């Protein structure tokens, strides 16, 4: 550390005085549903109500000089996080901040340019989960290499590696370098190790003032202590100012701080030296229990159910925050501490600030602007961001490679579809379609940028707070990564398609095509990236994306020729990059070509009509009157295109690209981690009458922090002494289910494969849990605690498991996974369900099918009583920012498992992680209560206080590598464990928490696994285990297996899951509104773009393309519905599938059925905005038939979208797959290539399997079949007859044969014969293989069949079972 000091020291210090922080006062808010959002009077009334301002931090003051550490303590909701955010100069989101904050001698405004030196580590762990630990830390340390290096280091790379290795070693996670960071859905390092990665990333900023918000969450006691010791050392050596808020801080941690500041309801009740805090509280009459955590004691004094008061002070002690503050304000200590507030005006502060500025200047690259808070050069920022961009791509190989492979397959299919397109008029549609698709598909693939933008945003906002790099560096890195990737993507597509289609066979033409396609793809990627950056919510961004994509496709020039665009929307063409690209590739292809007219485009043709002098082109744009051959340039001119525009358009596309990049940089630069008040309950509008106390309670907790608030639900603090009375079993206790089974595991080994070989995560672990036993599973971070729980609960799907896991001495029953409750570390719930709904859902699905519904619901009431959740039972689960708090969510997680009446045992993984001491004690108190009435409970726990640890009966202690170091009784206040370790050379010092002591001991160099295996306790434990297994096996099983994998029949599952999804969608107004808005806007766009189509030959194409455009409502809506589907699937796979709640078919059916009512509404709004606008037949028979098909299509594309999502690992992957699937369906529907011209390899099977074929067929028949056709002047084939014959005589044979569907308008003329290609729409449809009117109803029926069958099986995995 000393080697890393710069010549000038960065000793800054921070002082604040009269600091008050206010935010919008909101403890509960109503959540609208689909119907209530239209209650305009109510909404207007609420919007006019002036929002109440709530004081979050009230008149705080303090000073942390260089080299000092301040511990900020307070219950959740006290304002600790808000205080730290404001001290870290992060004020965005707060309504009002008053008072002074000084950094050295700088004001808060002056300090803004030193953003990277005043940093905050938040409680959230925001990372790219697929990157490894080393890649994550490499990036952070690269961005903070000083320009002037220490004398002992020669280059930036050496400094970066030295810094990285030091930080990894200091946090004890150097062994995880090649492991993914992971998150709740991506497997990676353990929770404690991930928290240490977060700490290292913050330390890598090499700042001067550090604010740490609950940064020991998820760390075991030993690692937490080591981390604070490390922070203490760095603070001392480097002269840092460290401000820390912690929950469940042990006394060893507490003693490392210089000062302590206690907040309660935002009021500062104590600020002073650490050693004076406890005597100060004792002096006011609050009793301290020997061995208790002093930090918890300091925050408990305002909690009536937790504090203990000296008898002689019962009538005089301060009862609330105001009285406590008032008492503190009168003390000499307050006056002494106030002397520090002049520090900013002192010579020391001025000198320190001057040195700080010089040191930062020396660190900063000279090429950066003077006011920039960054450290390394812009080139280094971009270079490092490019490396990370490729690491991100390569770390998720499936999402990167599979779409590329599918893209190539798509190219082969496309090439085969357009294979060897003729170089005459019959090939014009082929080539135009192929060129349009080349431009379109690559643009559609770019839509994934919107999803990717929102996935990356939280990490980028965090890095901006750390001043690691300029947002422009990230944007340019993406561009640099785009170029080779897009070049590869386009090349994989262009090579097969171009040469298989038989486009112009010259190198120059191919290179032009390739360059134009790359340019358009780059431009569209930049466009969608800009859209993603511009919006704060994904729903809004995807709504705009869907509409914009429809508009751009429609106005490319392929669906609507340039000359037929209506003026009110034709301007879209001129701002459309796709239009410029399409004109360029089309002009590149047809320039200089000679195109003979053939088949239907040559009138007359066939036997006896071979003289071109008496033939003419028909239906070909740009064809001169009477000509039988057309040049490519004439064809282009007919489309209002010109070859001279190719390179002009190329330049215009790149100008658009530059504009989109500038917009992306601008919007990305404005991303930030919003501070401000959050954390309030959300009440569904339909439950308003049941929860009025929640919404209007004036006394609801005052802490709108990012943490939970002890009172924000309007409930009294849990832990009422009456509840914990042991005077006899309560009514609740008597209603709780009791376990009778013995659960054992013996010789359990779990091995996984890693790049470096097999890795043993559990090594011959054994133990048991009996009814009435509360067992603790402990160990350092990464010791295998969660892994053991996963293996015991049968949740592992990979790796090799050996050993035995038995219930009552027998193999696990079929019903084990639903008979054992498992509360995972992460609280995964349906966010739009209420607490009661979540509990009832679990009870109804997981309790035995022999239990009546009434009794199941009564048991839910029992659990709500037990967990004291009455006041929040009708509030939405939501998120921690808007919904249940961390502790309330944890209670709900436990409740969801309890209501299932687990008949074997309950597993809990880190139930107290992230909670304050009081909340943690309440959770363990509940578990103790459960064990006391006969439940078997096994809990992993990280940082138990002495009083918490004393609640457990037994302990299984693991060391690194999943090795057992102790299994047995805890003893009274840990006496048995202490005796064991004392006897083996590690006695527990007096007044030391035994839990912290033993984890500290087993984390050392001594092999405690060997000590355990040689101990008499191990021998006795093995004998007891064998006895338990034999004894249980000799008796009838205590828990009878009903033989059912699921507790309820499939019909019940279907009803309950569908009901939950219906309720969820009813409340999901964003999703429903966006879906409806997309249909309304798309319908209007389609309708007004094809306004009142006429009856010319060209209008027949317009009929076709307006219907074809209707298909393109699907991509936008699918992109919107898939993330919702994947969120639900993640909930299902993370918890509900593992606990055997219900079958996948119930999951899929529930999602499908819940969508149906909204799909009907969507069909109605699209139909009403489109059908009559384009001028389709108004007769009820045809209009009704079209509506039926439109409705069926809504069902089809929803099924397709959900099926794609069901088989893809994530939302970005799904967005990449969508265009490929939709493109294949579009290809073979008979529009791009008519049936007769589809290659035989596809024609006889894929054409008939394509639902879009029948969709297009039915809609075309009903709208176009009976329409008369009237050719415009330029649409007639005009030619002369030989030897003075009349037109009728000359064409007699032709009109009987190939021209039977054409219309000769002047049969008696002898020259200038005028032939119209078609007489009715039916003649045109005949060329599309739609030969009769009944085809319409045939195809409509087949569309309905596809709608029913378009839903696919949800992917699922089997769990691993132990090998004996």
UniProtKB/Swiss-Prot annotation:
List, alphabetically, the PROSITE patterns matched. ABC_TRANSPORTER_1 (PS00211), ABC_TRANSPORTER_2 (PS50893)
Renumbered residue ranges of the record's region Disordered: 697-732
Gene knockout outcome: Does not affect cordycepin production but significantly increases the cellular accumulation of pentostatin.
Q: Which is an annotated Pfam family here?
A: ABC_tran
Keyword Transferase on entry: no
The way it spans or sits in the membrane comes to: Multi-pass membrane protein
Citing just one GO molecular function, the answer is:
ABC-type transporter activity
Q: Which CDD domains match?
A: ABCG_PDR_domain1, ABCG_PDR_domain2
Induction (UniProt)? Expression remains unchanged during the development of fruiting bodies.
Q: Residue limits of the ABC transporter domain?
A: 42-290, 737-985
Residues of this chain annotated as glycosylated in UniProt? 152, 214, 610, 689, 711, 739
Keywords assigned by UniProt? ATP-binding, Cell membrane, Glycoprotein, Membrane, Nucleotide-binding, Transmembrane, Transmembrane helix, Transport
Q: What else is known?
A: Cordycepin and pentostatin biosynthesis coupling is an important point of metabolic regulation where pentostatin safeguards cordycepin from deamination by inhibiting adenosine deaminase (ADA) activity. ADA is not inhibited until cordycepin reaches self-toxic levels, at which point ADA derepression occurs allowing for detoxification of cordycepin to 3'-deoxyinosine.
Q: Which family does it belong to?
A: Belongs to the ABC transporter superfamily. ABCG family. PDR (TC 3.A.1.205) subfamily.
Q: What does this protein do?
A: ABC-type transporter; part of the gene cluster that mediates the biosynthesis of cordycepin (COR) and pentostatin (PTN), two adenosine analogs with related bioactivity profiles as both mimic adenosine and can inhibit some of the processes that are adenosine dependent. Mediates the pumping of pentostatin but not of cordycepin out of fungal cells. Decreasing intracellular pentostatin releases adenosine deaminase (ADA) inhibition, allowing ADA to deaminate cordycepin into non-toxic 3'-d.
Supply the name of the protein.
ABC-type transporter cns4
What is the source species?
Answer: Cordyceps militaris (strain CM01)
* Gene name per UniProt: cns4
